[in-house]
């Protein structure tokens, strides 16, 4: 279990280095891909898919860590890719640096969540409290970062939404650790519903901030 967590952290660290070392040319090429025009309804659908993937693959990793299942490395790799995908989804509106920073914050979110799960499984209250404190600090940092980018997102509401996400994730992991599988499933259903609300907050905020790029129906984004 200890080695699994170390591998988990190492993969995240290596992925962060890889992303930060992207050349300007690579980022330009990526930007062209992520700047493809979409309708407001497509943005909503895509944002929901990305964030739903976030909770699905987070759950998959939780199961791997708690139940010590094979395929943990593969699940971690897929979860990390989701954070890149989420960052990329924000780039057409906020630029390369913002999307990259969001991905980095999400990496910290995931890495710290693994520490929280590890401590909970081990029954190490001190380690759990320390990791949990950093987890919530990262959540607040992410909320502030996002709300600075878009005034349609209210900081107090964003912080509450992010904190609810952490609370439900913790409950999901704890129920799994206790082998209360019914409660575990209920927690996942709850976080799945919660993440769709979060995704809609993001897509609706983007449309409000950039109304000139969106029209109702299937109209495409206006070309720059």
Protein language model regions, located:
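Bacterial N-terminal signal peptides that target proteins for export
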Residues: 1-12
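Mid-length scaffold segments of soluble, non-membrane domains
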Residues: 96-130, 135
């Amino acid at each position: 279990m200890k080695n699994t967590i170390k591998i988990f952290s190492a993969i995240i660290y290596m992925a962060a280095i890889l992303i930060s070392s992207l050349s300007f040319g690579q980022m330009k090429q990526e930007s062209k891909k992520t700047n493809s025009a979409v309708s407001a309804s497509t943005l909503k659908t895509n944002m929901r898919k990305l964030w739903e993937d976030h909770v699905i693959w987070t759950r998959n990793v939780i199961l791997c860590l708690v139940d010590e299942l094979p395929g943990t490395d593969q699940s971690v790799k897929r979860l990390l890719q989701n954070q890149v995908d989420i960052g990329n989804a924000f780039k057409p509106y906020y630029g390369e640096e913002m999307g990259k920073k969001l991905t980095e914050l999400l990496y910290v979110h995931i890495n710290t969540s693994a520490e929280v799960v590890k401590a909970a499984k081990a029954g190490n209250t001190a380690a759990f409290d320390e990791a949990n404190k950093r987890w919530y600090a990262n959540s607040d940092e992410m909320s502030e970062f996002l709300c600075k980018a878009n005034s349609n997102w209210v900081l107090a509401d964003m912080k509450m939404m992010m904190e609810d996400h952490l609370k439900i994730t913790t409950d999901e992991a704890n129920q799994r650790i206790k082998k209360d599988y019914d409660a575990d499933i209920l927690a996942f259903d709850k976080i799945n519903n919660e993440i769709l609300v979060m995704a809609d907050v993001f897509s609706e905020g983007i449309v409000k901030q950039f109304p000139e790029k969106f029209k109702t129906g299937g109209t495409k984004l206006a070309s720059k």
